[in-house]
A protein has these predicted regions:
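Short, solvent-exposed loop/turn elements at domain surfaces
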Residues: 271, 576-580, 679
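Pocket-flanking alpha-helical
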Residues: 604-638, 651-668
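Extracytoplasmic ectodomains of secretory-pathway proteins
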Residues: 499-556
Length: 696
């Protein structure tokens, strides 16, 4: 009886919990429009806000006309220059300007008419550290807005040779090398929050335009001041090519471009990868490591691009299908801009959206009704590029960035009065000392609610990434209702601001995988690449049995262990690092020394038992710093000082880097990496105080 009574009570409790959850979901606010409706969210409270933002800059010149006259200046026709010189020839162009990594170059530019312009720069990267080129632009001695002080110019990377196949049938991707050629780029937001190129206001007459180096040298050819255009819509694009016809050859053509066959990319990290988990990648293999897609985690920063070459067999209209996968962030959208031969054909493909899915999806570029877009191509070689693009999410992230800036201003003002550890027994009278802060908190809360609604409208659901914004909005409302709560919750307020900043960075990551792109005639069969139950089942079963026969821990070429000219190397790090190591060994060490190397990827826990059993390797890499001496105590490793070239090798190392590997006069390991300290500073605080960063 008691047992039955207990079960009834338990069932009733569960029912109550379920009922509460259901009621909560039914009564939960679908949006927060009531919180901010009727309020002006664009006006800042006096003394709290960013006056130098790009949005404020556009508001300042909202009535300025769009200039209708485009013109160009030669970079070599400068007025003043430091760390720069004219080159007679570079990359087929003459009379160009080399600018060093500490350069500052000014041009006197006669502007034909007052208005807003885009600025386009033609440049040529030079061999250096391989990072992006960065410049700050000044107009008449001043940086026009925040963001113009940090303009990035990408490099071009390509495969250093062909894909190699080892003696077990596994493909080994080539390393990346920089390709030097002339390229062009508009001045734009390096963070990608502002999707379109920056607009600059210039008055008619003489103006001084200055480029100041922030990072890396670069060669400049010309600087173009362009007419701002809104872009061509698909209807206009189709009308402009209405007279073009399609031959039978073009109408039935199918050109398949594999993702891993990319011809160029903006970052060396955007290399080909392999996926054995899916049953429908192309190419496909269960046992061998076959490169079959590109993108992934490295392809997440707005502005990064990958480009492929292809050949159209005949003049005509073509459809484009992309097989991609965005399984990195639930409730998020990864956007890509489509370029054909360096141009976005029409506005509708400025942002091609890939929604969350666990599976590979084929996306045919089409309108809202599902009618495929038609692209007109002439016969011959073409280039197709996909560039990471935040799309509508960029405006939200830009707004959130300004939110964080203002919230930090509020926090610092309060901190001046309360200190880092406020006295909970003291009445600070914040509403009387800083009434503008309380007013700003009320306004910022409404702005955050608006951002949350905008984000949900784009993604279709409340992402966990925007949860911090909601927490802050609620917290700010409570602060406004009861200012005495602010000192007590100051620590959590600071943490929430930091959390929102982290969320912004996370939301700006737009990862995507690409298996292949199909450019096909309008009469060709539609691309279908879905995986059925039986195909998935066969893939899973085959993959399972392959584990009994394939050594997945071996990297690259594997040689006979009994060969006297073979050494065994074990690595404890990730597979990607191991593949790079094996590639370096096979490309340089083995050809020069005629010593073959087997590389094995193993678990760190297996090392000690293997060594004690006499089955250990000749060399171990990526071990913890304390391990060499631990093994030296057991006489399980060799003293490196016995080798005649030891002191020549360690001459390049600071002695402190291998001190921990010394034991009883011997040295039992060499460092692979060395840590060092760096100092970060708050740019916003330095700017607020009007201080320059000390160059000491």
């Amino acid at each position: 009886m008691k047992k039955a009574k207990g079960l009834i009570i338990l069932a009733a409790a569960v029912a109550v919990i379920v009922l509460v959850v259901v009621i909560k979901n039914l009564t939960a606010e679908k949006n927060y429009s009531k919180k901010y409706a009727g309020y002006d969210l664009t006006a800042d409270v006096q003394g709290l806000g960013r006056d130098d933002s790009y949005v404020k800059y556009l508001e300042k010149y909202e009535n300025a006309p769009i200039a209708q006259t485009a013109f160009s200046i030669n970079a070599a026709d400068f007025a003043e220059a430091e760390d720069a010189y004219i080159m007679d020839e570079c990359g087929g162009l003459t009379n160009v300007l080399y600018t060093g990594d500490s350069s500052e170059v000014s041009w006197k530019v006669n502007i034909p008419e007052t208005g807003m312009y885009n600025i386009f720069v033609k440049y040529y990267t030079v061999s250096s550290r391989g990072v992006e080129v960065e410049r700050a632009v000044y107009i008449n001695g001043e940086i026009p807005f925040h963001g113009a002080d940090d303009l990035s110019f990408s490099r071009i990377w390509t495969n250093n040779g062909a894909v190699r196949t080892d003696n077990r049938g596994n493909q080994i991707r080539p390393s990346q090398t920089e390709r030097f050629e002339w390229q062009g780029q508009y001045l734009k937001d390096y963070m990608g929050y502002i999707v379109h190129p920056y607009k600059f206001y210039l008055e008619a007459g003489e103006n001084t335009i200055t480029f100041k180096a922030v990072n890396e040298p670069v060669i400049l050819s010309n600087i173009d001041f362009c007419v701002i255009t809104e872009g061509t819509g698909y209807e206009q694009y189709a009308a402009e090519h209405a007279s073009e016809r399609t031959s039978a050859e073009a109408a039935n053509a199918v050109i398949k471009i594999n993702g891993e066959d990319a011809a160029a990319r903006s970052d060396a990290s955007l290399y080909a990868k392999y996926d054995k988990a899916a049953a429908n990648t192309d190419p496909y293999s269960i046992t061998a490591t076959i490169l079959n897609y590109i993108g992934g985690d490295p392809w997440k920063v707005p502005g990064q691009w990958i480009e492929w070459d292809f050949n159209a067999p005949a003049d005509g209209w073509y459809n484009i299908t992309i097989k991609g996968r965005q399984y990195y962030e639930r409730g998020a959208v990864s956007g890509r801009s489509l370029y054909i031969d360096g141009e976005i054909p029409f506005k509708e493909v400025e942002t091609v959206e890939f929604k969350y899915s666990n599976e590979w999806e084929t996306l045919t570029l089409a309108d809202a009704n599902g009618t495929p877009y038609k692209f007109y191509l002439t016969a011959g070689d073409h280039k197709i590029r996909l560039e990471a693009n935040l799309g509508e999410l960029g405006d939200i992230l830009n707004t959130l960035s300004d939110n964080v800036f203002r919230l930090n201003q509020m926090y610092r003002k309060i901190l001046v009065l309360t200190g880092a550890n406020p006295d909970k027994y003291r009445d600070y009278n914040l509403d009387q000392v800083y009434p503008e802060v309380i007013e700003a908190m009320a306004l910022e809360s409404k702005r955050l609610y608006k951002v949350i609604d905008d984000c949900v409208e784009i993604t279709g659901q409340k992402s966990d990434k925007i949860a911090t914004a909601l927490t802050l909005a609620i917290q700010l409302e409570r602060f406004v209702e009861d200012p005495d709560e602010i000192p007590k919750a100051l620590a959590s307020f600071k943490e929430n601001i930091a959390g929102l900043g982290t969320s912004i960075l996370s939301m700006s990551e737009i990862k995507l995988d690409v298996d292949y792109i199909v450019v096909q005639g309008t009469e060709a069969d539609k691309v279908k690449d879905r995986v059925g139950f039986f195909r998935n089942a066969w893939h899973s079963i085959s993959s399972f049995f392959a584990t009994f026969f394939v050594d997945y821990n071996a990297i690259g070429d594997v040689y006979d262990e009994d060969d006297e000219e073979v050494i065994e190397v074990w690595l404890l790090s990730g597979r990607d690092q191991n593949e790079v190591m094996k590639m370096m060994v096979d490309d340089t060490f083995t050809p020069n020394s005629h010593i073959k190397v087997n590389v094995q990827l193993i678990d760190a826990g297996a090392l000690l038992s293997a060594v004690m059993a006499g089955n250990g390797p000749d060399v171990v890499l990526t071990v913890d710093a304390q391990q060499p001496v631990n093994y030296a105590l057991r006489h399980a490793v060799e003293d490196l000082t016995q080798f005649p070239d030891f002191y020549d090798v360690v001459a390049d190392y600071p002695e402190s880097s291998y001190t921990s590997y010394k034991f009883e006069g011997g040295v039992y390991g060499l460092p692979e990496t060395q840590n060092y300290n760096v100092m970060f500073y708050r740019k916003d605080i330095m700017e607020e105080l009007g201080l320059e960063v000390p160059q000491t």
